[in-house]
C-alpha cells in the first residue's frame, strides 16, 4: 500500500510486542504463540544502526540509499528478506467451513466482564499432508452468521490443531460486518457475512497439521460488548482463506545473537 502510494519503505518486522528489538532481557516474558518459539533468534542488535542510516540519508542526504525491503521474522524465529510484505507471489487456499467439524453453534458472553457463556470450535483438515505450509499475509474468514440484535462480536483464535499452538487472531463487532470504520444497523434474525481479517501472520504449519478456529465473544485485551448474554451470534459456516508462500531458503537472513539473549528462557 505504501509502496503503491510512492513512498520508500523498509521494514524490520519481529515479534517483540512493545519492547525494543534489542531488549533481550524482556523478550523471555513472551509466551508460547506470542513470540516464545522465536526467543533464540529474537534479538536484533542492528536495528538502531538501520534507523541511523535511514535518517542520515533521508534527513541529511548523507550516505548511500538504504535497501528498500522487508526483514520479516517467522513465528519459529527464522528471519528472511522479502521485496515487500505481504509477499506478492503468495497464493491463497480456501477452506469451506462445511468441510470442517464444528462444535457448538453460538458465540455468547457476559456483559462487560467478557466471560464466555458459549463458543464455537471449528477443526479443519491439514492444507497439505506432504509439505509444510508457510502462512504469510492476511488470512481472512468470511463467516456466515445470524444476529440476535444490533450488537455482539466474535473473537477468533487460529491454532495448530495438532500442537494447540496459537498462530494468530481476529476480532469483529457484528455491526462492522462489511469491514471499514462505519457501523451498519443489524436487525434481529438477520443473516449476514462477517468479513473478518486476521492480524498479520507469518507462521509455519507443519505437514499433516490441521487448523483449529476457536470462536468466543472476546479475547486478548479486547473489551466485551455491553449487550453480553443478550446478543448471541449464531455461526452457520463460511470460508477461511489462508495465504501461503514457497521459499527455498535463499533469502534467509542470519542475524547475530548474543549468548545471554539466545538462552534467556
Task: Report the location of each language-model feature.
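Short, well-ordered beta-strand segments
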Residues: 2, 54-57
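A generic structural motif
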Residues: 11-17, 243-245
Amino acid at each position: 500500500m505504501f509502496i503503491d502510494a510512492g513512498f520508500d519503505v523498509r521494514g524490520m518486522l519481529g515479534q517483540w510486542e512493545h519492547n525494543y528489538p534489542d531488549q533481550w532481557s524482556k523478550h523471555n516474558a513472551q509466551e508460547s504463540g506470542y513470540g516464545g518459539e522465536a526467543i533464540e533468534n529474537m534479538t536484533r542488535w542492528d536495528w538502531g544502526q538501520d534507523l541511523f542510516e535511514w535518517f542520515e540519508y533521508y534527513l541529511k542526504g548523507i550516505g548511500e540509499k538504504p535497501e528498500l525491503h522487508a526483514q520479516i521474522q517467522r513465528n519459529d524465529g527464522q528471519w528472511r528478506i522479502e521485496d515487500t510484505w505481504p509477499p506478492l507471489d503468495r497464493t491463497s487456499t480456501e477452506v469451506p467451513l462445511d468441510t470442517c467439524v464444528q462444535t457448538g453453534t453460538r458465540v455468547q458472553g457476559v456483559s462487560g466482564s467478557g466471560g464466555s457463556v458459549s463458543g464455537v470450535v471449528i477443526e479443519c483438515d491439514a492444507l497439505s499432508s506432504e509439505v509444510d505450509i508457510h502462512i504469510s499475509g492476511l488470512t481472512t474468514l468470511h463467516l456466515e452468521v445470524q444476529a440476535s440484535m444490533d450488537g455482539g462480536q466474535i473473537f477468533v483464535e487460529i491454532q495448530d490443531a495438532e500442537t494447540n499452538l496459537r498462530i494468530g487472531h481476529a476480532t469483529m463487532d457484528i455491526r462492522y460486518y462489511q469491514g471499514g470504520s462505519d457501523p451498519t444497523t443489524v436487525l434481529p434474525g438477520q443473516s449476514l457475512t462477517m468479513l473478518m481479517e486476521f492480524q498479520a501472520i507469518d507462521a509455519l504449519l507443519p505437514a499433516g497439521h490441521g487448523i483449529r478456529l476457536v470462536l468466543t465473544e472476546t479475547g486478548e485485551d479486547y473489551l466485551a460488548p455491553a449487550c453480553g448474554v443478550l446478543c448471541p451470534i449464531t455461526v452457520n459456516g463460511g470460508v477461511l482463506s489462508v495465504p501461503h508462500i514457497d521459499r527455498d531458503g535463499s533469502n534467509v537472513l542470519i542475524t547475530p545473537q548474543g549468548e545471554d539473549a539466545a538462552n534467556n528462557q
